[in-house]
């Protein structure tokens, strides 16, 4: 059994590739079923966010394992293998464990130490539990990563400063508009990232917030919290002209805001500028919108410079966190190795018990037939001893014949011989 982590993220692939490799929530079960149908895969978890798509797997070792899994990923998303290989990373066993712990702790995030990723990892794991998780080692690896992430957050200052993609989006808005108290903001979506954006905006006393979402009930809960108006996604075209700032983050596979829609809004606004921050993957706003005069479009990749500015105070904490991850990875791998030994021990004990039961049954049968008890017990002891020491004796003899003193000493130690 081998543990694997493979995928792409914001450091290895542009958003144009990440959106093609992402797994939409409504097709995740289908993807997991397809993945687990691969003969080498024993268990799997798919983590797909704005900034990464990763597969965490428990697999049987085989020739061309990497090629087979890359081929599956490319076939599933209709991708060119060469395009994917340039951006793909591949971690195995110790490195896979360490990678997951770093991801869950926010150490591999676009925003160092951001807490949202832990919830996303937990959801990915929960989704895999719906009839898809088959490997206890993989399950244990995820459970361990959750406890490591909690330890990192409580024992270090990794989460001390408020930096996230949501915070960066609001920072960008404050840099462009002198005061948010005079602007109208349209939020498209009502997921976790938009919730954070809305709360940041409320803290900065934005004049008016409008939330557009496919599901009105979810949007209304957020709107009640932050004092916003709720509209349907189908109303975005009509209401877009009211918005000075548009921040969008949905799970839509296709763009929601097109170039024509923004052109009409700008015309109604008499070309007053609009800031559009698209933090969705796949993108919610057509890239061509950025070519329009007075439309300032930023994607998740464009937020990098803002985020980088806020990282200084987290870097020292990250060093401490990396030490924790290294320690916990080492402990997990020790547990994993012990599991392998435990299976061997169980097999060895079971074999010895079979020999014992077989010889004991024969001895009891002989006693029932009136045989001499002392002779039967001596015969049982002699046969039991010979059967149990037969295999170790052959190994000792072979090591001696080979002149392999190191193996001979290992066997002596394992048999408790001084």
Swiss-Prot record:
NCBIfam families: hemA (TIGR01035). GO terms for molecular function: glutamyl-tRNA reductase activity; NADP binding. PROSITE patterns: GLUTR (PS00747). Possesses an unusual extended V-shaped dimeric structure with each monomer consisting of three distinct domains arranged along a curved 'spinal' alpha-helix. The N-terminal catalytic domain specifically recognizes the glutamate moiety of the substrate. The second domain is the NADPH-binding domain, and the third C-terminal domain is responsible for dimerization. During catalysis, the active site Cys acts as a nucleophile attacking the alpha-carbonyl group of tRNA-bound glutamate with the formation of a thioester intermediate between enzyme and glutamate, and the concomitant release of tRNA(Glu). The thioester intermediate is finally reduced by direct hydride transfer from NADPH, to form the product GSA. NADP(+) binds at residues 189-194. PANTHER family: GLUTAMYL-TRNA REDUCTASE. The keyword Ribonucleoprotein does not apply. Pathway: Porphyrin-containing compound metabolism; protoporphyrin-IX biosynthesis; 5-aminolevulinate from L-glutamyl-tRNA(Glu): step 1/2. It catalyses: (S)-4-amino-5-oxopentanoate + tRNA(Glu) + NADP(+) = L-glutamyl-tRNA(Glu) + NADPH + H(+). One of its GO terms (biological process) is protoporphyrinogen IX biosynthetic process from glutamate. Its EC number is 1.2.1.70. Substrate binds at residues 49-52, 109, 114-116, 120. Keywords: NADP, Oxidoreductase, Porphyrin biosynthesis. Catalyzes the NADPH-dependent reduction of glutamyl-tRNA(Glu) to glutamate 1-semialdehyde (GSA). The active site is at 50 (nucleophile). The record marks 99 as: Important for activity. It is an enzyme of class 1 (oxidoreductase). Belongs to the glutamyl-tRNA reductase family. This is Glutamyl-tRNA reductase. Homodimer.
């Amino acid at each position: 059994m081998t543990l694997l982590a493979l995928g792409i993220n914001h450091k290895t692939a542009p958003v144009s590739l990440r959106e093609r490799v992402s797994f939409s929530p409504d097709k995740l079960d289908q993807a997991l079923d397809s993945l687990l149908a691969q003969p080498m895969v024993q268990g799997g978890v798919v983590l797909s966010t704005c900034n990464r798509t990763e597969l965490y797997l428990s697999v049987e070792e085989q020739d061309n394992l990497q090629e087979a899994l890359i081929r599956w990923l490319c076939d599933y998303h209709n991708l060119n293998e060469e395009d994917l290989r340039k951006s793909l990373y591949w971690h195995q066993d110790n490195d896979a464990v360490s990678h997951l712990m770093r991801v869950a702790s926010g150490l591999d995030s676009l925003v160092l130490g951001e807490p949202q990723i832990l919830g996303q990892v937990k959801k990915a794991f929960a989704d895999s539990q719906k009839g898809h998780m088959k490997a206890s080692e993989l399950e244990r690896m995820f459970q361990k990563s959750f406890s490591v992430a909690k330890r990192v957050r409580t024992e270090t200052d990794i989460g001390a400063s408020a930096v996230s993609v949501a915070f960066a989006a609001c920072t960008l808005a404050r840099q462009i508009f002198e005061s948010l108290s005079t602007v109208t903001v349209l939020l498209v979506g009502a997921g976790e990232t938009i919730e954070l954006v809305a709360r940041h905006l409320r803290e900065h006393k934005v004049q008016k917030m409008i939330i557009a979402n496919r599901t009105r009930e979810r949007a209304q809960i957020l709107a009640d919290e932050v004092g916003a108006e709720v509209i349907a996604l189908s109303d975005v075209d009509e209401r877009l002209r009211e918005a000075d700032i548009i921040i969008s983050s949905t799970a839509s596979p296709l763009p929601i805001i097109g170039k024509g829609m923004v052109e009409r809004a700008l015309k109604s606004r008499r070309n007053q500028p609009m800031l559009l921050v698209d933090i969705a993957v796949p993108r919610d706003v057509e890239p061509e919108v950025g070519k329009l005069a007075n439309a300032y479009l930023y994607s998740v990749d464009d937020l990098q410079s803002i985020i980088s500015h806020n990282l200084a105070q987290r870097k020292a904490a990250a060093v401490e966190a990396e030490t924790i991850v290294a320690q916990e990875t080492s402990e997990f791998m020790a547990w994993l190795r012990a599991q392998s030994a435990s299976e061997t021990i169980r097999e060895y004990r079971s074999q010895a018990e079979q020999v014992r039961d077989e010889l004991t049954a024969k001895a009891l049968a002989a006693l029932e037939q009136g045989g001499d008890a002392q002779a039967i017990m001596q015969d049982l002891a002699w046969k039991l001893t010979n059967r149990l020491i037969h295999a170790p004796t052959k190994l000792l003899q072979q090591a001696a014949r080979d002149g392999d003193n190191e193996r001979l000493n290992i066997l002596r130690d394992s048999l408790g011989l001084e």
